[in-house]
Regions:
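Phosphate/dinucleotide-binding and metal-coordinating scaffold of catalytic cores
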Residues: 1-186, 190-192, 203-350, 355-359
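Canonical protein kinase catalytic loop motif
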Residues: 197
Length: 359
């Protein structure tokens, strides 16, 4: 691409993206946001096409494209649909990741969880997921990692409660962030997602009104034993709240859900069969593997239902009202056990449709 440094990339692209409302320009430039932003103006798609294919190119690309500033490890590109909607197209490493995103959308729809709606498509003879831009032209996406780095850490709190506290200090209503956190904790366990890190659960802020809300659930591709040999329900190391632990922690992290009464777990009836159908669409997942995944999901559903029943009215959880003296607001947050306080004290935050559509 002929880019020698990050500074050169910034100068050529103006730092424009589809994830925030910020950009740079020379002081003498007469460029205006209204004429250059990617939310309302057309952009070059050649760079994105090349990034999403397996073919190399010596072409000198225009950086008037959001692809130059899009993060993440998987190949992806932006395009503009006929109605003007910005669409993110994302591939995977194994071919299963795009299907997993669709399955996660189905699951969230069943449970009434706000989530990005993914669809399945085909690009360059490979399965891809597609989803619409989640922001308006006055909003920015702020990652949990950025938010946690912006506040002083309170080591009296567990990792989960430090996140809740930081989100509240950033301006998000306490109940909203607690509910959103519960949502992805539940979905991640049911899907066996192994890659929920501090850069893929976020808040959305309106830069004009400064109102803050949780981002809808997204990025659940690393799920359903994708790329793994063994398919079983052994406990495993879970991100993000126990990422530094050496022992399996997924079941422990599931127990951080604060309010099970929000979920109608009866809506999970038949979900494993739907998953099997979705996985069979591309022909990339063997039938024996699909059967094994469906069997494990049935067991996970039973486990989640059992935990929800035993949680009852959450009477075993000690809570504390954190008021102005703590700088946290007045939300009710679970108070960590003494053991958890010790264990988390040295934590260092880490960044760490029914048929295909062709593009």
């Amino acid at each position: 691409m002929g880019i020698r440094s990050a500074v050169e990339l910034l100068n050529r692209s103006h730092g424009l993206s589809l994830s925030d409302q910020y950009w740079v320009k020379p002081e003498s430039s007469d460029l205006e946001w209204d004429t250059v932003n990617f939310f309302t103006n057309p952009f070059d798609e050649e760079l994105g096409r090349t990034l999403l294919t397996a073919r190399s190119s010596s072409h000198r690309f225009s950086l008037n494209a959001p692809d130059a500033s899009t993060g993440g490890d998987l190949p992806k590109r932006w395009t503009i649909a006929g109605d003007g909607t910005r669409i993110l197209i994302k591939a995977g490493r194994t071919g299963q990741e795009p299907v997993n995103e669709l399955i996660a959308s189905d699951l969230c729809s069943r449970l009434g969880i706000p989530a990005v709606r993914y669809n399945l498509g085909e690009y360059d003879n490979r399965p891809v997921s597609t989803c619409p831009e989640m922001l308006t032209d006055t909003e920015e996406l702020v990652s949990a990692w950025q938010i946690l780095e912006s506040v002083k850490r309170d080591n009296r709190l567990s990792a989960r409660d430090q996140w809740i506290r930081a989100a509240q200090l950033f301006g998000c209503e306490g109940a909203a962030v607690v509910h959103a956190t519960d949502d992805w904790l539940l979905v991640d366990y049911l899907m066996r997602n192994i890659d929920r890190h501090y850069n893929n659960f976020d808040l959305i802020r309106d830069v004009e009104t400064l109102r803050v809300r949780p981002a809808p659930l997204f990025d659940t591709g690393a799920s359903l034993w994708c790329g793994e040999l063994a398919i079983d329900n052994r406990d495993y190391k879970a991100k993000p709240f126990y990422a530094t632990y050496k022992t399996p922690t997924a079941r422990r992290q599931l127990r951080l859900i604060s309010d099970w009464t929000r979920y109608d777990l009866g809506k999970l009836d038949g979900w494993e069969e739907q998953v099997g159908h979705r996985l069979s669409v591309t022909g990339l997942v063997p039938e024996t593997r699909i059967t094994a995944i469906a069997t494990m999901l049935s067991a996970r559903i039973r486990e989640v239902r059992s935990l929800a029943e035993s949680a009852g009215d959450d009477s075993n959880h000690k809570t504390v009202v954190m008021g102005a003296e703590t700088g946290i607001g007045t939300g009710m947050l679970p108070w960590p056990s003494p053991m958890e306080q010790v264990e988390m004290g040295n934590l260092h935050w880490q960044s760490t449709t029914s048929g295909p559509t062709s593009f």
